[in-house]
Structures are given as structure tokens and as C-alpha cells.
Amino acid sequence: MDYDVIIIGSGFGGSVPALRLSEKGYRVGVLEQGRKVSPDDMRAADRSLRELFWIPQIGFRGFFVQHFFRHVGIVGGVGVGGGSLVYAAVLLKPGEAFFRDRAWADLGVDWKEELSTHFDTAATMLGRTPNPDHGKMDDWLQATAEAMGAGDTFGPVPQGIYFGNAGKTEPDPFFGGQGPDRTGCTRCGACLTGCSDGSKNSLDKNYLYLAEKLGAEILPGRKAVSIRPLEGGGYEVQTLNPLNRREKHQALRAQRVIVSAGVVGTLDLLFKCRDELRTLPEISPALGDIVRTNSEAIVAALSPNPDEDLTRGAAISSHFHANAHTHITQNRFPPGYDFMRWYMGPLTDGTAAFRRALSTIASIILHPILTLRALFARNWHKRITVLTVMQSLDSQVAFRRGRRPIWPFKPLLHSSPGASGGTPAYIPEANEAARKLAEHIGGTPHNNVLESIGNASVTAHILGGCAIAAGREAGVVDIDHQVFGYPGLFVTDASAIPANVGVNPALTITALAERFSERFPPKGAD
């Protein structure tokens, strides 16, 4: 065997077992399809979409990825560190509704109690601390919260950022000198295009860094394309380099394989192995049945002042709870996110998809000057306040993989409405928040046109598809994250989460991966 354990993916669900299983004495190999991203790469990403976006088919070699499906648009990160490269480092625990959700409440586990210590461990490892700043955008969000009758819930977000002394590099402040040197946050607002200062506690600064020191091997440019069980036990993983498909890789073998390729990557790989390659034909028929968007919506308000500059600070610095099931944060955008202006349209209400789309298009046609003024606004990224709205309510889409009339040449992942009828493209609380914010600043409120015209949810926090369940009829993995029917094959990323978290899920994914790793047997125990 090449390794004791192969981990596919280096995001939150993969980096935790990379460290913890290395601590238990296992030989660990981590496969990552993207590159190891340097500070120079991050600075370049703020200036060039080619350096920001991951679209290897056309030579875009960045670390930010967008997936567009009929019912949902998904954004995420690719590279060593996965989603942590482009996340806003918000580290929140979910509310009671998540732990009591019927999707996993009857599995014989008190999830709130059992995960409690793992949340603490995850918070320590990711360096959680309250955001110390309060600027103009935070004032505006506070006013929005008060206008919605939720002012008492407003506050700073707990965050995985080393604030320290701005711009000053100091010895590791987190792991007793065992971690890398760190530089204090300069409040540049570029968290979402990568922290070139090294202040954000991305996974390459903690779990992956420490795992490598213990002997774990991280292999960038390795996309897993098949998993095959071996006679006598163990698995073989075949890989390719997405940026150079002519590059030949020898298949890697390990006694155990952990799949943590992000929801889209994990589903695509497991569907391919089950239905196309037939190497894992016994994977549950429930694969892809219940995928969650965290019931998310993206809205915004544009300041009327062309000289406004809201970019100073972390990407997200404050939040509030509009009601028991709705959580709202603000977002600052870096220069590299200026392309997002083309996704914004007028704010329109309504649950009837066709009528809402017509209303949006009519508003654009009837008010062309307002539309053009917003689209071509000077200093747009400095003036825009984006709100991420998340809910813990039950909603879902389903994913399948196959040939489609629009592209019959090869099987592709595609979405369909879930058992609940789909995820919301319209969230009333989101539109209310955007409208209240715009009224407060004298600006214009906006919807994302993928939601208002396309009737698709937009999320940075996709969940589910390989849900934890009591058996293969209901889900893909058991309470120890092992795939039903395949001993030694596990799924530990967000795709194992069966319910909407309702807040930014990074801390929850990390805590679940910590629980998995703790329950993983010591080397030689079996």
C-alpha cells in the first residue's frame, strides 16, 4: 500500500483527519485537485479573473470556483486548503434547530452534547476570536437589524483571523511555536480572494501545516477520478491533473479512503464510481437525494456616494438574527469581486417564479437609467454592501449524474427539485433586509438575478447529498461516516451533513470531522 489512509480533498472535512490520523500514526496522503496557492497568487487574483477563477478547461488556474445548475448556483474554493482559501472565516455554532432536525435526531446520538467538545477543539484550532472592529458598514447593518426589530441580536462575528498587530509578522501565536509565523490583519477586505497577508487562519496555517510536520503528504494537482476496491481489502484511487490531462499518474493504494472533495466534487466522484465505472455499485440509492443550500439568499444595497469606500475591515465583521430561523451577515468585496456587479438586478418580491422574473425584467426595461447607473457604478466594489441571508428551515434539491439533452456527450452532474419542492430563490426576510438597508443609506436595493430571474438559489454553503443516516435506504454513511456496504470508505465533508446549519457552516464541518477522527481507531487496533 502507498498509504494507510488516502484523503481526497484538503478542505475542512479533509484537513482535520489529515492531522488527527497522522497523530495516531497513520501514513496519510492528501489529494488536492488545485494548486498550492501563494500570497503572490492571491494578489494576482485581485487583478485578474484568470488568476482568480478555477476553470481548468480553458486555462483559468485560480482557486475560486462557481458551479451553475438549474436549481442552484454554488461558489467555493479549490486548492490546498479548499474552501478556507476564499471563506470569510466566520466561525459560528448552529442553533437548536440544527441539532434537533428530524433528518438525524433519531439516530441514537445526542448531537449537541456529543459535538460540544469538538466545537471547542475546532474553535481553538481555527483561532476563533470576536472581530474587534466596528466601521460604517457595521453601523449600517446594525441600523438594518434595528429596523427589522432585531437590534438586540446584532454583534460582531466570531472569526478565524489573527488580528494581532496590523502588518507585523510574529512567531506562531496559536500552537506553542509549532505553527507558522503569522502577520496581523491589515483590514484590507480581501478575505474572499485569499489573504495574501497570511492573517486568515486558513487550513494551510493550522491543520494541514501540522499534519505535514507529522509526515502527511499533500499532493496538489491530483484530482481523484475513480475509487476501486481491492481484493483482500483496501482501495485504489486513480487521479489526473486537471491543468495537464496528459500528465500520467500511477494509481495510489491505501487500506482506507476518506472522500472530502466538497459537495459537488464528492457527489460527482461517487456517482461516477457507482453508475458509470461500476467500481462502487452498492453505494446507497439515496446518493444525492437530499442536498441543502443552507436556505441561502444573496441581496445587496449600493451606496449613492460614488466616493464611498466600505472596504476597510474583514470581509464579514458583524451579523444579526432577523428571527428564530434567519441569520444575516454583511460582506465587503475586494477588487477581484467587481465581476459580481453583473449578477445584480433590481429588488423584486414574490414566490411565483415566472411572475417575479417578468417583474424583474420589466423593472430593468422601464428604468434603464437606474439599471445602467447601478451596473456601471464607479467604485462599485467599494460602495456595495452585500448581505448573506441563511435559514435553518427545511429545504432541499436533489442531484443526479447523467447525459442531458443540452450536453449529451458525457455524463454530468445536474439538479432537480427535492422532496420539499426545491430550495428558496426568494426569501422575504432577505428582501426586507436589503430594502431597509437601502432606505437607511439612501441607496438602491438589489437581488441576485440568478435568484430573481433564474429562480435558482445561490449559496456558498452547499450541504448534504451523502447524509448520515440509520441505513442505506435513507442515506449514504453511518454515524461514523462510513459508506454503507464499503468498509474503510468514508465521507467527512459537508456532504455528510443532513440538515441546514442556518449559519456559516465551517465550524460545524470541522467539529464533525474532529468527532470522526476521535472515533477512528488507533493504528493497529483492528
Predicted regions and their residues:
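Redox-cofactor-proximal catalytic regions of oxidoreductases
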Residues: 49-133
